[in-house]
Structure formats: C-alpha cells, structure tokens
C-alpha cells in the first residue's frame, strides 16, 4: 500500500469516527432533531437514503397480526422506479402511455422464468393473475408479486403506475415484528424528509391489528446508508 493510500484510509477512518461521534447513542431524538443529526453525521460521497426501522409489538406468525400496506410518500423516494405491467394486448398502449417501462403478458412471464427481472414494481390486471401464478414462487420472495391489497392488481392501470412512479413504498412486518424502509434521499430538504416520515409512521400506526394487546409501537430508529443510527423518542410521535 502506497503512502497516498495509507493517508486516504486514515483520513476516511477519521471522517467516519468524527461523524459517528456527532450522534449520541444514549439520546432519544424527535424526528426533526434526528434528521438534522443524521445529515450532520453523514460522511459518504454519494447521496445516502434515509432509512427507518420500526419494532412493533406483534407476532407476524399469527394471521391476525400481519401488518402490511403501502404508503404514498409526499416527497417521493428519490429513486427511478421501473414498472412492469402485465395485461392483455388491448390495454398495452394504455399502460405504455401511462409510463410503464415494460408491458406485455407471456413475454414478461418468460423473462421472469429465465431470471430476467428488470423492474421494481409489477402491476397486473385481474384477468392475468392465473398466468402470473406460474411465477409466484419467483416474485413472492422478492416482494414483487402483484397484490390487490397493495393496489398492484387493478383495472386502473394509469393510477397504479402513477402511484408506483411517484413514490409509493410497500411495508411489511417481518420476523420479530420489524419493518424496514427507505424514505427518501438525505439530500432532500428537512421538510420533505419529515413529510415522508410522518406519512410512513402514520400509515403503520393506522395498520395496528384490531384487538392487539400491549404496546404496538416498541421502537423507531432512523439511519442513513452506511451512517450512524439514532433512536426516536416515541412520546414525540403524534
């Protein structure tokens, strides 16, 4: 390793250490202060994503305690979303005009079977679900299987594409009741990040299973990609 490489490595380590020292691990933050802290502590050269982790007091193994849904983020995600629409030929032009990146039927199914998944969201009309069932085992684990509860199995192709492109985020509680999602880029204004945070947290709170006993919201953590993590003061959540 050259002297230059050593200097760069030392400099990088110093930046990481200094950035992390700005965040106090034993402090609870409200959302506004948390966003400000994460921005000041970010040291990476790329535009990191603001990430949220929510710990819920549920047991997803029970069917009546599944927490899942979608949220339209007011300020978007900052990502370019590729949308595939599986529909009959007579609706393909409508899907293309609405902004779909990939449109078709059996051609898309064949690509999926071949391992070619070049989309982030898959939308389908109800009459195509029997065909899509043949690739459910491929799409399901990737979170790409169209679902009427998430608005991705619909006759309203135009609106579904609009929602997906404008910043619709899916959430689902995994094992131990953990929800994880990216809610925008750290370069967003504080106001836009707070709008996204409030929309997402509000949606998860509204999704509380009926009849659930005990505390539903156990903990919330915010972090940025490769950055420090801060814990949110739950009493500050309205």
From Swiss-Prot:
Belongs to the universal ribosomal protein uL1 family. This is Large ribosomal subunit protein uL1. InterPro entries: Ribosom_uL1_bac-type, Ribosomal_uL1, Ribosomal_uL1-like, Ribosomal_uL1/biogenesis, Ribosomal_uL1_3-a/b-sand, Ribosomal_uL1_CS. The lineage of its organism: Bacteria, Pseudomonadati, Pseudomonadota, Alphaproteobacteria, Rickettsiales. Gene3D superfamilies: 3.30.190.20, 3.40.50.790. GO terms for cellular component: large ribosomal subunit. Part of the 50S ribosomal subunit. Pfam families: Ribosomal_L1 (PF00687). Binds directly to 23S rRNA. The L1 stalk is quite mobile in the ribosome, and is involved in E site tRNA release. Protein L1 is also a translational repressor protein, it controls the translation of the L11 operon by binding to its mRNA. It comes from Rickettsia prowazekii (strain Madrid E). One of its GO terms (biological process) is translation. Keywords: Repressor, Ribonucleoprotein, Ribosomal protein, RNA-binding, rRNA-binding, Translation regulation, tRNA-binding. GO terms for molecular function: rRNA binding; structural constituent of ribosome; tRNA binding.
């Amino acid at each position: 390793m050259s002297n230059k490489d050593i200097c760069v490595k030392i400099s990088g380590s110093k930046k990481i250490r200094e950035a992390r020292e700005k965040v106090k691990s034993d402090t609870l933050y409200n959302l506004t202060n948390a966003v400000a802290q994460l921005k000041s502590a970010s040291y990476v050269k790329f535009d990191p994503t603001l990430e949220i982790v929510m710990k819920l007091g549920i047991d997803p193994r029970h069917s009546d305690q599944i927490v899942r849904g979608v949220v339209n983020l007011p300020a978007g995600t900052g990502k370019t979303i590729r949308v595939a629409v599986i529909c009959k030929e007579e609706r393909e032009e409508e899907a293309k005009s609405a902004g779909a990146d990939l449109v078709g039927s059996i051609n898309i199914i064949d690509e999926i079977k071949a391992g070619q998944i070049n989309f982030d969201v898959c939308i389908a009309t109800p009459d195509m679900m029997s065909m899509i069932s043949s690739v459910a085992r491929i799409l399901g684990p990737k979170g790409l299987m169209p679902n009427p509860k998430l608005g991705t199995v619909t006759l309203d192709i135009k609106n579904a594409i609009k929602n997906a492109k404008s910043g619709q985020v899916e959430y689902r509680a995994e094992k131990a009741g953990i929800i994880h999602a990216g809610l925008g880029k750290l370069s967003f204004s504080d106001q836009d990040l707070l709008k996204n945070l409030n929309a997402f947290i509000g949606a998860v709170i509204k999704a509380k299973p009926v009849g659930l006993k005990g505390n539903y919201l156990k903990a919330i953590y915010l972090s940025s990609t490769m950055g420090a993590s801060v814990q949110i003061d739950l009493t500050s959540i309205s």
